[in-house]
């Protein structure tokens, strides 16, 4: 082998040795398993190495590390890269990370575990800790954000009343909601659309529209505390079209207004209604008309709105009486207080005006469906009359009965007495002498029309001598062959 070949072989060996040495230093301890513990991040914590299938902490005095944490950090770049973290920041002991576990002490080059020994529990050595930068999070490039649009409301439109005037039901400030957008409605005094008011009251199931309230009337008497809690929303709607037929057509959005006046309505079904009664008459259906406000009863003063019969007919129905009979005004004391209703009917009176001097009252008379019965004195008189009638019948009844029977028998005796056959032309007449004598002896019988009805009582002369003789003979010798009670043959012989 010549010198040239020897030189080439030596160069090759030196290159191989240099490559080996550079490879070892470049890997910088990547041949060991390292992890960081004791924190919530994988990029900071106590250094633990895997030896003998166990994870062990490393004493901070190992590998002759300096006290400068930042200088030591340069030697831990390979470890941070292996942990997929950023650049190293500090390497050394940290009092906050002091949890040794199977701790070892290593010598030699940094991150070499060829010369590591277990330490005793008596050795006071803080574990070695490492802090690396957190890995950078890769975020996708920003995309163009579409413009935000407010979706159209899907809930059906609705109305709501915030109680205002004296806390009455079906009265108050009107709020309109369309989806999630809600608010009160701007009210303009020049606009008084009756159709819109009826639509609002009908939608709220409160009957028909009565009136709008101005700001002063809407304030009125304050409502109870429990009803004043809900405050009306600000004005966000207006009603440009008063002749609309649906809620969505009636209202349109407007800018929020704090100083404007909100729409306030009173519907016919407001509650509670005015209570009324009639006092001072003979029954509950007659008397002076009185009304009640809260717990106070006062007379209802006469007003121009009550000139017709409508108010008083309604009052009669309210008292469960019949039809209205009459009504008239009655003078009252000048100091007598009362209430005044400005509406035509009491059912429309949402507010009663207090008056200190009620000069004219109204006396109303309604038909009483349940009139009073008979007085006790009248009933007693009727009973006494019936008792007397029964006693009278008991005393006089038999006498009257006897007289009636006797009169009936006398009528049966008034019959013709004379011949009944064809050839029997003989008749019996009272003699004139007997008749005159009987009238003289019995003057009371002269007025009798039928001279046969009452025979003479005090006369010794018979009025019918032939007849009496025949009767006497026939009674002694009865003849059954004759149909008559008188023996006519004997009478003919006489």
From Swiss-Prot:
Disruption phenotype: Induced Cd5 deficiency compromises gut barrier integrity accompanied with reduced expression of several anti-bacterial peptides and mucus components in gut epithelial cells. The frequency of peripherally-induced regulatory T-cells is decreased while the propensity of T-cells to secrete IL-17A is increased due to a STAT3 activation.
Pfam families found in the cross-reference section: SRCR
Gene Ontology annotations of biological process type: apoptotic signaling pathway; T cell costimulation
The name this protein goes by in its record: T-cell surface glycoprotein CD5
Phenotype for residue 486 to F: Complete loss of LCK binding
Coiled coil: none
Biased composition (Polar residues): 439-461, 473-483
Signal peptide: 1-23
Keywords assigned by UniProt, alphabetized: Cell membrane, Disulfide bond, Glycoprotein, Membrane, Phosphoprotein, Receptor, Repeat, Signal, Transmembrane, Transmembrane helix
């Amino acid at each position: 082998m010549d010198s040239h070949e020897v030189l080439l072989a030596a160069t090759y060996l030196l290159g191989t040795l240099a490559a080996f040495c550079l490879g070892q230093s470049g890997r910088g301890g990547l041949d060991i398993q390292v992890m960081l513990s004791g924190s919530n991040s994988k990029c900071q914590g106590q250094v633990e190495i895997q030896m003998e299938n166990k994870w062990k902490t490393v004493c901070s005095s190992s590998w002759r590390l300096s006290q400068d944490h930042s200088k030591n950090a340069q030697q831990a770049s390979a470890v941070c890269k292996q942990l997929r973290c950023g650049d190293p920041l500090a390497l050394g002991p940290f009092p906050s990370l002091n949890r040794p576990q199977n701790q070892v002490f290593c010598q030699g080059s940094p991150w070499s575990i060829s010369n590591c020994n277990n330490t005793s529990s008596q050795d006071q050595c803080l574990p070695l800790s490492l802090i690396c930068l957190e890995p950078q999070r890769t975020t996708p490039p920003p995309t163009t954000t579409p413009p935000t649009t407010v979706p159209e409301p899907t809930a059906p439109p609705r109305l709501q009343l915030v109680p205002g005037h004296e806390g009455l039901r079906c009265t108050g400030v009107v709020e309109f909601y369309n989806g999630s957008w809600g608010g009160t409605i701007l009210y303009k005094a020049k606009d008084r659309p009756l159709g819109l008011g009826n639509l609002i009251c009908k939608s709220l199931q409160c009957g028909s529209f009565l009136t709008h309230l101005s700001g002063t009337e809407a304030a009125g008497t304050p409502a109870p505390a429990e009803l004043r809690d809900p405050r009306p929303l600000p004005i966000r709607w207006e009603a440009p079209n008063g002749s609309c037929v649906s809620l969505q057509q009636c209202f349109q959005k407007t800018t929020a207004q704090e100083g404007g006046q909100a729409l306030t309505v009173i519907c016919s079904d407001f509650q509670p209604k005015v209570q009324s009664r009639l006092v001072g008459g003979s029954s509950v259906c007659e008397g002076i008309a009185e009304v009640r406000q809260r717990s106070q009863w006062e007379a209802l003063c006469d007003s121009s709105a009550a000139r017709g019969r409508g108010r008083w007919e309604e009052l009669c129905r309210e008292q469960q009486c019949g039809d209205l009979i009459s009504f008239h005004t009655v003078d009252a004391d000048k100091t007598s207080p009362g209430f005044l209703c400005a509406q035509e009917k009491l059912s429309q009176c949402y507010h009663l005006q207090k008056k200190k001097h009620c000069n004219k009252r109204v006396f109303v008379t309604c038909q009483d469906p349940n009139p009073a019965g008979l007085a006790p004195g009248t009933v007693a008189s009727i009973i006494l009359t019936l008792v007397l009638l029964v006693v009278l019948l008991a005393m006089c009844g038999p006498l009257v009965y006897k007289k009636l029977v006797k009169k009936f028998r006398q009528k049966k005796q008034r019959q013709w007495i004379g011949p009944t056959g064809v050839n029997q032309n003989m008749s019996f007449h009272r003699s004139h002498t007997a008749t005159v004598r009987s009238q003289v002896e019995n003057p009371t019988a002269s007025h009798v029309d039928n001279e046969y009805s009452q025979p003479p009582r005090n006369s010794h002369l018979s009025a019918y001598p032939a007849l009496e003789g025949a009767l006497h003979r026939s009674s002694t010798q009865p003849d059954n062959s004759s149909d008559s009670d008188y023996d006519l043959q004997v009478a003919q012989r006489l």
